[in-house]
């Protein structure tokens, strides 16, 4: 797919997701929209026993390891107060954390992987994870066993503090989570 065509496709996909946000474990339309787009691109969808979320797979023509690529698809219970032409049409819900962008970016990666699968060494499982904003979305996906053969899973998150075109990479945890803890330490001098 030509760059301009891909950009237009992903922009439209992003805007549709942004206009129709769904909360954790309620991502039914989002799930169906993702499935339709993946199927239209000839990308295989794995059947997993979850009501929302999608796992797809691109099998490379060459043998190799299996990797995962992950994004989150749920929105937040926040009213959107913008005048964007693609602002949320769902009262009290919006993609305030960038999950619409994450989904569009990973969908774009899936399209490119599918387009180049003859050159691909190994397999890529692509997770459109439900319920990231709750504390159990990843856990429910992992419990299905669909990622038991994966060597590593790569995820992404927008970062407004980085300049456009910059990629930030770090081993270990990078961002906050929905579970919180408090740590107190004492020292003796």
Which residue ranges define each predicted feature?
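Conserved small/polar residues in nucleotide/adenosyl-binding loops
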Residues: 187-188
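Short, solvent-exposed loop/turn segments at the edges of secondary structure
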Residues: 149, 176-180
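Short Gly/Pro-enriched turn/cap motifs at secondary-structure boundaries
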Residues: 46-47, 132, 171-176
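Acidic/His- and Gly-rich active-site-bordering loop/insert found
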Residues: 2-95, 104-107, 111-120
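Beta-strand secondary-structure signal
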Residues: 55, 68-70, 125, 180-184
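Structural motif
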Residues: 48, 97, 127-129
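Acidic/histidine-rich catalytic neighborhood of metal-dependent amide-processing enzymes
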Residues: 101-171
């Amino acid at each position: 797919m030509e760059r301009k065509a891909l950009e237009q496709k992903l922009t439209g996909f992003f805007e549709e997701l942004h206009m129709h946000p769904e909360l954790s474990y309620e991502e039914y339309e989002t799930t169906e929209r993702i499935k339709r787009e993946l199927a239209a691109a000839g990308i295989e969808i794995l059947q997993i026993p979850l009501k929302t979320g999608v796992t797809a797979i691109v099998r490379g023509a060459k043998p190799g390891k299996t990797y995962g690529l992950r994004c989150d698809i749920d929105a937040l219970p926040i009213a959107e107060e913008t005048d964007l032409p693609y602002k949320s049409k769902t009262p009290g819900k919006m993609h305030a954390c960038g999950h619409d962008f994450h989904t569009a970016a990973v969908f774009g990666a899936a399209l490119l992987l599918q387009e180049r699968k003859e050159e691909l060494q190994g397999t890529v499982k692509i997770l459109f994870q439900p319920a990231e904003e709750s504390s159990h979305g990843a856990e429910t996906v992992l419990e299905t066993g669909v990622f038991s053969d994966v060597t590593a899973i790569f995820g992404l998150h927008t970062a407004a503090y980085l300049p456009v075109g910059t990629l930030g990479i770090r081993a270990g945890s990078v961002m906050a989570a929905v579970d919180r803890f408090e740590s107190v330490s004492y020292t003796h001098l």
